[in-house]
Amino acid sequence: MESFKYCFDNDGKKWIIGNTLYSGNSILYKVRKNFTSSFYNYVMKIDHKSHKPLLSEIRFYISVLDPLTIDNWTRERGIKYLAIPDLYGIGETDDYMFFVIKNLGRVFAPKDTESVFEACVTMINTLEFIHSRGFTHGKIEPRNILIRNKRLSLIDYSRTNKLYKSGNSHIDYNEDMITSGNINYMCVDNHLGATVSRRGDLEMLGYCMIEWFGGKLPWKNESSIKVIKQKKEYKKFIATFFEDCFPEGNEPLELVRYIELVYTLDYSQTPNYDRLRRLFIQD
């Protein structure tokens, strides 16, 4: 007879723990709700209580990604959904804490242009909501954008940043942060040690879009010093950037315009989300 490991969340729900999905700073497990089901439809993220990013992620889910607020926001705008996971459980032991979300599928790898356009709109909507709540995501990269049953999900809220100081003034641009993340998709501000602002989230999304549309990031496999140097140069010469991303000259004009608009944003500027979104809405 198979034996099961399990734990209880703060609401008393029992979660049966399956195989490890990922082991890094935090550990991800497949989990399920009961013994009768053989399907592990959920994922548990667990880490030591001393690891602050997981605590920050849990707090972000509770205080910012409130389901009722999301529902009201989407209904007011006529949006089908936001790429934000639902939280199904939070728990802790003497030494560890965890949260549970649905198994959200695989990394988004578009099969056609239509799905790319839809993904671009959904992600712009999602970032607009997060920004409207006074935060940035800070870690937009392909592995954090999943798809299941044609529904996207943006995961990993461990590096979110507050946009405003006390008094509702925008945070200042200061190059005093220790950078972290995937250098291929990192925004220039983050490379330089500044907190990711709204333009940074949208810039990182742009690098994901380039690959979704079949392009390549010219700085891949380069050192971090070369990566930031190239990104800074490409911001000055966008035409050259797209020649290197799409050597066959098949870059979508909508994507070029998106990058142009994002690259011209000031650090504290509120993006024109409608203008960005309309680039990818197909009639």
Swiss-Prot record:
Its main location: host cell. GO terms for cellular component: host cell nucleus. The keyword Cytoplasm does not apply. It is found in: Host nucleus. Pfam families: PK_Tyr_Ser-Thr. Belongs to the protein kinase superfamily. Ser/Thr protein kinase family. Poxviruses subfamily. This is Pseudokinase OPG198. It comes from Vaccinia virus (strain Copenhagen).
